[in-house]
């Protein structure tokens, strides 16, 4: 159960908040998950929505990379909602079911393909030590270049922000398959 009242109807908001609610509904198809808490601050919700739109739909990174990164970040941050939501998104983006199981089980980077392991290591170092080693930095930099590395870092930050919101307020509206629950 959520720790604060969740905003599920636009009528619960003042006029400016209703516009943000509508924009979220239009861009995402539904107003759920972190938006149920973020809408207590419509301006924050709107700015978060814009960042998320760039990360998810406009980034120069391959969609599969974005969804895999989101999935690893959600799992490493033990964020039930983002994990559940992105299992489906990752599958649709082409992340293999076995890879999703490895992320779910928090298996070592060596159990992933080389390209997956690079992202797993990068996300885990950022989330757990708040820094990346020189070798991880160089690997990611060599693969994605400056712009791509900035976008990958921002993707991790975006999903960390959502995880903080969801985990703080206990907002969970998505459910993963039974064998992938966290």
Roles of regions detected by a PLM:
Residues 1-182:
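Hydrophobic alpha-helical segments
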């Amino acid at each position: 159960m959520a720790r604060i009242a969740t905003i599920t109807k636009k009528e619960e908001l003042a006029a400016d908040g209703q516009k943000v609610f509508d924009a979220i509904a239009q861009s995402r198809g539904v107003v759920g998950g972190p938006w149920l808490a973020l809408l207590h601050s419509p301006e924050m919700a709107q700015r978060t929505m814009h960042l998320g739109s760039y990360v998810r739909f406009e980034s120069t990174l391959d969609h599969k990379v974005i969804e895999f990164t989101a999935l690893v970040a959600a799992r490493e941050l033990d964020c039930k909602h983002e994990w559940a939501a992105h299992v489906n998104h990752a599958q649709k983006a082409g992340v293999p079911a076995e890879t999703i199981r490895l992320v779910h089980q928090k298996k070592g980077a060596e159990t992933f393909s080389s390209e997956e392991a690079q992202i797993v290591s990068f996300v885990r170092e950022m989330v757990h030590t708040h820094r990346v080693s020189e070798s991880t930095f160089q690997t990611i930099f060599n693969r994605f270049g400056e712009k791509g590395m900035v976008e990958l870092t921002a993707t991790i930050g975006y999903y960390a922000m959502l995880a903080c919101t969801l985990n703080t307020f206990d907002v969970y509206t998505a459910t993963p398959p039974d064998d992938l629950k966290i």
